[in-house]
Amino acid sequence: MTQYFRALAFFLLLVPATAMACDDWPSWARGACQRVDQIWNEGGNDLYLTGYSWHNRAMYSSDKIRSFNELAWGGGLGKSIYDEDGDWQGLYAMAFLDSHSDIEPIAGYGFQKIGRIGADTRLGIGYTVFLTSRSDIMSRVPFPGILPLVSAGYRDATLYATYIPGGKGNGNVLFMFGRWEF
């Protein structure tokens, strides 16, 4: 449990770091720093709720599937904007129950190209870059990742899905979560 609190403290330290001035950053990183600063200072507030993960039945034995937790309950907070092109960009921090019912913290950045179907309905496709920590991977040492991200939204609510790739007996998980803009 101590390792969990260390990982959570690490993620919480990332949040205030986004508000720092970008002038001292190298020129190649300044644009990213300015965008993160914009999201943090101008973005709306988001509530994230997690709830479901599906393990690809073709990649695991029946016994292993039965041992997994597929109700990935959890939640978190974030900030996001729709940029000058109408694309969504956000920062988030969440914690949820992983496949082994252990708490998995995650914090990151998401980007999606948004297609509007109507005034209130939208579809998105993009990616998320994140840091996470798992008990079964590197003994809770935080590690980075990047995953695809698709969404369908209506007004202030958005449903997201990502697929965690893997090989036979690991990964291959569809993870779904929601976001409420408030």
Swiss-Prot record:
It comes from the Bacteria. The record marks 64 as: Role in lipopolysaccharide recognition. The keyword Kinase does not apply. One of its GO terms (molecular function) is O-palmitoyltransferase activity. PROSITE patterns: PROKAR_LIPOPROTEIN. It holds the Pfam family PagP. Keywords: Acyltransferase, Cell outer membrane, Lipoprotein, Membrane, Palmitate, Signal, Transferase. GO terms for cellular component: cell outer membrane. It is found in: Cell outer membrane. The active site is at 55, 98, 99. Transfers a fatty acid residue from the sn-1 position of a phospholipid to the N-linked hydroxyfatty acid chain on the proximal unit of lipid A or its precursors. This is Lipid A acyltransferase PagP. It comes from Bordetella parapertussis (strain 12822 / ATCC BAA-587 / NCTC 13253).
